[in-house]
Amino acid sequence: MVHYKLSYFPIRGAGEVIRQIFVYAGQSFEDHRISIEEWAAVKPTTPFGQLPLLEVDGKVLPQSHSIARFLARQFGINGKCAWEEAQVNSIADQFKDYRNEVRPYVMVKMGFAEGDLDALSKDVFLPGFKKHYGFIYNFLKTAGSGYLVGDSLTFVDLLIAQHTADILSTDPALLEEFPQFKAHQEKVHSNANIKKWLETRPETQF
């Protein structure tokens, strides 16, 4: 039996979609959570000095979206054809662009940097959120299935549904402009495996 080990910090962050891919597929995995204190010693041993890392029978794969794409293909949630897979990957790449754009706000909010959180919210996060969620919303409306691509769940549905849930828990008014995202989040999180995971996973702020 293949042994999967996911190493990431004890937060949701970039590792959560990977955890949820395993959960959705019903695949057991080792959820290795590395504390900030442990990270200094671990960092030099990683390929790019970053987490998450996936180990598959001892072979190491870095980069969150590379891991997600690999597992999505393994478990059949990467799209039903090459075109759908390309669309799925484009949404994942766009979401990474969004995260990079709002990173200054997120770093201050998480306490990893200093800055004016209110100003960063107004000038960085809100414009970035509306722009990028608007792009992704177009995929949801075009698909017309309740999923982002095609007529079945793909890993980007897990990715976006988790972020939507995070937004709903902190500032639900942001989604008034994108009403179908709430229904999308509810649809994705109604899956029995995912629902159980959300109820039992470790509580983290981010």
UniProtKB/Swiss-Prot annotation:
Transmembrane segments: none annotated. Glutathione binds at Y8, W39, K43, G49, Q50, L51, Q63, S64. Disulfide bonds: none annotated. Residues 2-79 form the GST N-terminal domain. PROSITE patterns: GST_CTER, GST_NTER. GO terms for biological process: glutathione metabolic process. GO terms for molecular function: glutathione transferase activity. Residues 81-206 form the GST C-terminal domain. Keywords: Transferase. It catalyses: RX + glutathione = an S-substituted glutathione + a halide anion + H(+). This is Probable glutathione S-transferase 8.
